Amino acid sequence: MRVKETLNLGKTKFKMRGNLPVKEVERQNVWAENKVYEQRQKLNEGKPSFILHDGPPYANGDIHMGHALNKITKDFIVRYKSMNGFRAPYVPGWDTHGLPIEQKLKQAGYDRKKMTDNEFRELCRKYALEQVDRQRDEFKRLGVAGEWDNPYLTLKPEFEAAQVRVFGAFAKRHLIYRGQKPVFWSWSSESALAEAEVEYHDVTSPSAFYGEHVIDGKGVLDDDTYMVVWTTTPWTIPASEGITIDASFDYVVVQPAGENRKFVLAAELLDENAERFGWEDVQVLKTVKGAELENILCEHPFDNSRHLVTMLGDFVTLDSGTGLVHTAPGYGEDDYRIGKQYDLPIFAPVDDKGFLTAEAGDDFAGVFYDDANKIALDKLKAAGLLLKYMPYEHSYPFDWRTKKPIIFRATPQWFASVGDMRDEILKSMDDVEFFPEWGKKRLYNMIRDRGDWVISRQRVWGVPLPIFYAEDGTAIMDEVTINHVADLFGKYGSNVWFERDAKDLLPDGYTNEHSPNGTFTKETDIMDVWFDSGSSHQGVLAERSYLDYPADLYLEGSDQYRGWFNSSLITSVAVSGHAPYKQVLSQGFTLDNQGRKMSKSLGNTIAPADVIKQMGAEIVRMWVASVDTSSDVRVSMESFKQVADSYKKFRNTVRFMLGNTADFDPKANRVAYEDLASVDQYMETRLNEFVAETKDHYDHYDFLDIYKKLINFLTVDLSNFYLDIAKDIMYIDAEDSHSRRSMQTVFYDVLVALTKLFTPMLPHTTEEIWPFLKEPEEFAQLAEMPAVQNYANSDELMAQWTRFMDLRSNVLKALEEARDAKLIGKSLEAHLDLYVDDDTQAFLDHLNTNVRQMLMVSALDLHALSDAPEDAETFGDTLAIKVGHADGDVCDRCRMVKTDVGSDEAYPMLCARCAAIVRENYPESVTTGLEA
């Protein structure tokens, strides 16, 4: 018989390598076949609900790392809640209308103008559904659990019907109106945009400083005076209707040397502009307050038959420019507001494609707006009005879909009034909890400062605005017509709007005083896609009986403060008077390792599919837990490799414990807590702390803290201590000994707790572990989270072992120094002499543990501190340590150096402890003998 055969060496079929890219797919197929998600939902029937409402990603293209970050985080939460006492169904959704799909069809060669609207819409629908299928497979491959066979889609008839009813709630409160005012206009999309559809990029614009000739100075300014105006959009000068100044600013009338003309500009900006214009010996003729310049008239620089009025506004700054702002009410929100105040015309001579119209003048007609800048500058120069041209770098709005710059343009649009219910919206946020906390202020400020919502779009692929027009042009959107349209959409889908004439979309026998002849027409615009997704609280939460409205949680990227969080809040307050969510959690963007936005053009993208193919979805999931998602997250293959190392640590730790509990039956072999060895009670209590901390972090969505705690628990508590000292008990002591069963009890409890706690994060791996445990549930996902125990005297126990760990740290330091001095090789070769004070001696006695075994040395003697020799190393005033080489020979079984090796003649290579264990448990070895 060989010595090795007498050891309890761990054995398990749980593999060291997970082969995740292959095994994950197999495991997901098993879940699908066994309907594990559905089983979990059935188990949770009757429990309190927790509803995480999915913000719908756009159905176009493969998912990117931002999608993975978001969906996996949601999966953490839903899985945890489902295992922790809540009914937590997850309904994924998709945003399926909008311009990008139209553009994809255009790129594929389809010409919208050569087919009917319904033919084009059908192509859009098919494309959207293809993209949904594509992304659904990719999300499922990440291991995300949910109702993948019953998602919500904004193109489904029941959703469109609910959306129309949301519109009806606005209309009922008289919050829908038709107006002509500047909106974000995308010439590349030929449509108005909402603020949430705009992104900003740094650009260089042509900046012009020019004079506008005073023709009526109201007794304040002479006729030979020029107002110095600044603009970064010279192409808008044909639509200029005035000059805006600030009533409280000081303005100066100056005359530079060699100039016959006088100029007006802000006093505070005189010096920098004089230098800019090359003015010398500037004489200040007069200083006046802005209020004194109100209503002064100037000549339009391109049309002397038009007059420009000087107005007082609150948006003029002294940060740059001249303190006088060129104002075109048809081309800007501030301009529009002050133009309305002064009753100016709203003039925007530019068409849908960005080309100036004949109203802009002969020189500009048919010219693309950006090209018109040069014409405007040339005209200013020819008229002697241009004082300075210079490039100006600033942030400028772009269409987030086409990535092309946009313009402000006054066009007739439908608006939802935000201003009329702003206070109600802001008040509704009082009861909403935000993660991070600053999110509340961010959303509050956005709602406080935003304008009314332009909800009309001049496109085809979307939900039509359910508005009819009477014979005299009166817009009809009463409760009767809107509910009827909603019913039609619910039955036939929104295609019915394009298939039928207006009269066939109205209720039978419908009459309206504004159409005495019974003739009606219908609106051709569709709704903003943010109205689509923003209505999901009605189209999904209120529509499905097993969901709740308001939802417990909305979780999306931080860009959704101006997107989905924003639009959903507005629509919910309009419908119900309250927020659609109880909590809002926002995440940062995924960037490359240099902090740049990922894009195909930069070649810096890392797709989830690439990482999954190489390392597995578990690594992507663990990576999500390992990063601080409250701010922007940098992504690199190196970061995934680092996480893969942590995953390997988790897997190997589990494998070691599985191997050492293979012969453990929790029903037959479990040792009660009060009968556990002291060190095992300590680890059981430490595990209990870990469970409590981890569950608390789950409850507060602190996944990074969970990851950190896991790595610390695996490394510090288990690998560096407990699993290290365990080998002397697990391998050496008799298989059924109390000491071994005591430790196996803790091993098993650690395994079960780790498996349950990390099923939300690493479901593929924990389900691989689960069959090795003797638990009643078929799948880990069907188990409940471990309960936090209330052990007696746990505080005292933890205090004692914390003190022991401090002593152990000093011992490890002394052993390291002894190794460096070549006194010993391995720690097991050491003989320790510990010199302790009376209090430490009493503490060690009370600890009731084998101190030598806990310190992993072959021999240990305790002495009074007063007996410490001079060459002992002191640690504070309670401990001194002397390290020497243990006397005796190495036992072939426990590898300790013992003086009693060979004391049993039958086992000459074993120490007395090992000989006794072998003699009792392997009696045949007495006659056959042992071989090394």
UniProtKB/Swiss-Prot annotation:
Locus of motif 'KMSKS' region: 597-601
Places the protein is found: Cytoplasm
Molecular function GO terms recorded: aminoacyl-tRNA deacylase activity; ATP binding; isoleucine-tRNA ligase activity; tRNA binding; zinc ion binding
One Pfam family per UniProt: Anticodon_1
Residues that coordinate or bind ATP: 600
PANTHER family recorded: ISOLEUCINE--TRNA LIGASE, MITOCHONDRIAL (PTHR42765:SF1), SOLEUCYL-TRNA SYNTHETASE (PTHR42765)
Family membership: Belongs to the class-I aminoacyl-tRNA synthetase family. IleS type 1 subfamily.
Note on domains (UniProt): IleRS has two distinct active sites: one for aminoacylation and one for editing. The misactivated valine is translocated from the active site to the editing site, which sterically excludes the correctly activated isoleucine. The single editing site contains two valyl binding pockets, one specific for each substrate (Val-AMP or Val-tRNA(Ile)).
Family matches, as HAMAP family: Ile_tRNA_synth_type1
Stated name of the protein: Isoleucine--tRNA ligase
Organism: Lactiplantibacillus plantarum (strain ATCC BAA-793 / NCIMB 8826 / WCFS1) (Lactobacillus plantarum)
Gene name of the encoded protein: ileS
